[in-house]
């Protein structure tokens, strides 16, 4: 979460009159994040999150994202619930931006998750996949292989400025993926961005999932692979087998992976690492410092890609 657009108190108070959230008592911007402007609201009826959607989120996608959050919440997934205005709408306009109020979730994101936390994430991810299976709306993954290629075409000529030899490495990865990317595996709604800053905990118990603005339809096992990348590597880029084993066991306790999904996990993990490396690389090379987008060093995902290239079996991730 972050703040890129300021909101005047009077303007916010008038906006809130359209919602059943009581009177504004106080509000403050939330500094963390990369995509939208977020504020914590305290009102006479409780606490809420206000999100203003910046340019990277397409307004046409908002009904999918918000509808999914409502669907999952109604299915028992602990995630924010959009607040409906008095006129029945969910999406409003504030400070010239599409704006939504969502319920507040208790908990904190973790900087140093343990294996116990990873097991909780695995269970929650599987529960999300099952709960989303009958969601009636669909959204293609804009950051699947075709989307990766567009990013790579824009960044390739300068890739070796970041890491010597990177262009040749990624070219070889693309050749492999475009021939051998897994097809026909179980698929449906995935979160696609379940990083530690998008998961809240109260102690060792997971209390909520947030930030569904990359959610889409894709392979369930690809979502698992993304979580392996996000949760199971240490600061020195080493893979923590104990965390990997815990995350995968947690997932399989709710939704067992098929044999085909297990066999595909090394390639899916490498592809997921490439996807996040590419978005970071593109921003690193094309976004000016001080702009609306928070730039992240692509190096850690280059290291993950190299790790996954050497993996021969999902058992090396801790899969029983």
Curated annotation (Swiss-Prot):
Gene3D superfamilies from the UniProt entry: 3.90.1200.10, Phosphorylase Kinase, domain 1
Record EC number: 2.7.1.39
Q: Name any one Pfam family assigned in the record.
A: APH
Q: Which reaction does it catalyse?
A: L-homoserine + ATP = O-phospho-L-homoserine + ADP + H(+)
Alphabetized CDD domains for the sequence: HomoserineK_II
Q: Which UniProt keywords apply?
A: Amino-acid biosynthesis, ATP-binding, Kinase, Nucleotide-binding, Threonine biosynthesis, Transferase
> Record keywords: Nucleotide-binding included?
yes
- Pathway listed for it? Amino-acid biosynthesis; L-threonine biosynthesis; L-threonine from L-aspartate: step 4/5
**What InterPro entries does its record include?**
Aminoglycoside_PTrfase (IPR002575), Homoserine_kinase_II (IPR005280), Kinase-like_dom_sf (IPR011009), Pseudomonas-type_ThrB (IPR050249)
- What would you give as a GO molecular function for this chain, any one? homoserine kinase activity
Carries keyword Nucleotide-binding?
yes
- Record-level GO BP terms: threonine biosynthetic process
Q: Hey, which family's this protein in?
A: Belongs to the pseudomonas-type ThrB family.
Name the UniProt record assigns to this protein: Homoserine kinase
Please tell me the species this chain comes from. Mesorhizobium japonicum (strain LMG 29417 / CECT 9101 / MAFF 303099) (Mesorhizobium loti (strain MAFF 303099))
